[in-house]
A protein has these predicted regions:
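ATP-binding pocket architecture of kinase catalytic cores
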Residues: 1-56, 67
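Short charge-dense sequence patches
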Residues: 7-13, 28-39, 97-108, 156-166
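Flexible, glycine- and charge-enriched loops at secondary-structure boundaries
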Residues: 13-20, 75, 140, 144
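Alpha-helix N-cap/helix-start motif at coil-to-helix transitions, marked by capping-box chemistry
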Residues: 21, 52-59, 122-125, 145-148
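Alpha-helical elements of Rossmann-like donor-binding domains used by nucleotide-donor carbohydrate transfer enzymes
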Residues: 22, 26-29, 60, 84, ...
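Active-site acidic catalytic loop and adjacent metal/ATP-binding pocket
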Residues: 27-31, 84-131, 138-142
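An alpha-helical support segment within catalytic cores of ATP-dependent transferases
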Residues: 35-47, 52-53, 57-97, 159-165
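Active-site activation/catalytic loop segments of kinase-like enzymes and analogous catalytic loops
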Residues: 59-68, 127-164
Length: 166
C-alpha cells in the first residue's frame, strides 16, 4: 500500500504524519549516501538536473495547471520567477542524488516502514526539488502546518548527516 493510500484512508493522523516524517528522513540519507560513488553516466535520462530540465518542469506546470485554470496572471513575471528559481536550483552547492518524482504515491509502506519505488528519473540535482515534490504534491494536499514541520524535520535530518547547518 502506498503512503498516499494511507493518507487517503486514514487522513491527517499522527501515524500518517510519522510516515511522512520517516520518509523524508530516509530521503535525506538517500540523497547524501546514495550520491556517494554513484556513476551518473548510467542515468536513464540526464546525468544532472540542469536548467533546461527545470524549466521544462516549470513550463509543464504552467501549461497544465495555471493555463488550465483560465485565470489571469502576469505571464512575464511568472517566467521571470521560473528563471530565478531555475538559476537558484542549478547553482546550489548541495547537489546529490535526486529522485525527481518523490511523491507519496511512490512510497510503499510495509510494517510502518517506507520503501521507495520509481527511480528511473533519478539523477544528480538539488535535494530541495524532491522535498518540494513531496510537500506540495497536489493529491496529498498537505496542511501548511504539516509542510512547515516536515520541512524542518527534513532539514534537521540532512544537517545531522552532513554535520553542519544548511
Amino acid at each position: 500500500i502506498s503512503l498516499l493510500n494511507r493518507l487517503e484512508s486514514e487522513g491527517f493522523s499522527d501515524e500518517v504524519y510519522g510516515l511522512f516524517k520517516k520518509s523524508l528522513e530516509t530521503l535525506a540519507q538517500l540523497h547524501i549516501k546514495g550520491d556517494e560513488g554513484l556513476d551518473y553516466n548510467n542515468c536513464l535520462t540526464n546525468k544532472e538536473f540542469g536548467k533546461q530540465a527545470i524549466m521544462a518542469d516549470l513550463l509543464y506546470f504552467k501549461y497544465y495547471f495555471l493555463d488550465a485554470l483560465r485565470k489571469p496572471y502576469d505571464k512575464q513575471k511568472l517566467i521571470d520567477d521560473f528563471e530565478a528559481l531555475s538559476n537558484y536550483l542549478t547553482h546550489t552547492e548541495y547537489k546529490y542524488f535526486m529522485f525527481r518524482d518523490f511523491q507519496s504515491r511512490n512510497i510503499m509502506v510495509r510494517n510502518n516502514e517506507p520503501f521507495f519505488i520509481d527511480y528511473q528519473g533519478g539523477m544528480k540535482g538539488a535535494p530541495q526539488y524532491d522535498v518540494a515534490s513531496m510537500l506540495w504534491q497536489a493529491r496529498a494536499n498537505l496542511p501548511d502546518e504539516w509542510k512547515n514541520s516536515l520541512l524542518e524535520d527534513y532539514m534537521n535530518a540532512f544537517e545531522n548527516i552532513i554535520g553542519q547547518a544548511i
